Amino acid sequence: MATMQFDLVSPERRLASMEVTEVQIPGADGDLTAMPDHSPMITTLRPGVLKVSGAEGEKSYFVTGGFADIAGPSATILAERAMPVEEVTGEIVEELIKASEEQKSAASDGAADAAAKYHADLTMTLDAIVGR
């Protein structure tokens, strides 16, 4: 089966660099799956779970947002914040939700809808991960 290079980086660290058969991406305009020889594209990410499949099995990462750069032989994810889903703890959930609530309440009229959508996406994803 054909593979593509996958890289996931955040400001804190490089989380993954491996050959994969597909990457499921939580895009801001909807989820998408990138596979080898995918048409080139750049998209923004929403809070969600990014899943990769390859010879090592399936791995899942929580991302808060960022960008995905997909170009035929590779997919590079530049995440604002990312971690393996196994590392998401109750403390991290509370920290992220509190920050999102503060951002939502401080948003100007023009940014209120975007802040509310971000908060809803973040809360839904974190609830699914920790089973709240």
From Swiss-Prot:
Subunit structure: F-type ATPases have 2 components, CF(1) - the catalytic core - and CF(0) - the membrane proton channel. CF(1) has five subunits: alpha(3), beta(3), gamma(1), delta(1), epsilon(1). CF(0) has three main subunits: a, b and c.
Record-stated family: Belongs to the ATPase epsilon chain family.
Keywords: ATP synthesis, Cell inner membrane, Cell membrane, CF(1), Hydrogen ion transport, Ion transport, Membrane, Transport
One matching Pfam family: ATP-synt_DE_N
Localization in the cell: Cell inner membrane
Official protein name in the record: ATP synthase epsilon chain
Family matches, as InterPro entries: ATP_synth_F1_dsu/esu, ATP_synth_F1_dsu/esu_N, ATPsynth_dsu/esu_N
Gene3D superfamilies: F0F1 ATP synthase delta/epsilon subunit, N-terminal
Keyword Transport annotated: yes
GO CC, one annotated term: proton-transporting ATP synthase complex
NCBIfam families per record: ATP_synt_epsi, PRK13443.1
Key word Cell inner membrane present: yes
PANTHER family: ATP SYNTHASE DELTA/EPSILON CHAIN, ATP SYNTHASE EPSILON CHAIN, CHLOROPLASTIC
GO terms for MF: ATP binding; proton-transporting ATP synthase activity, rotational mechanism
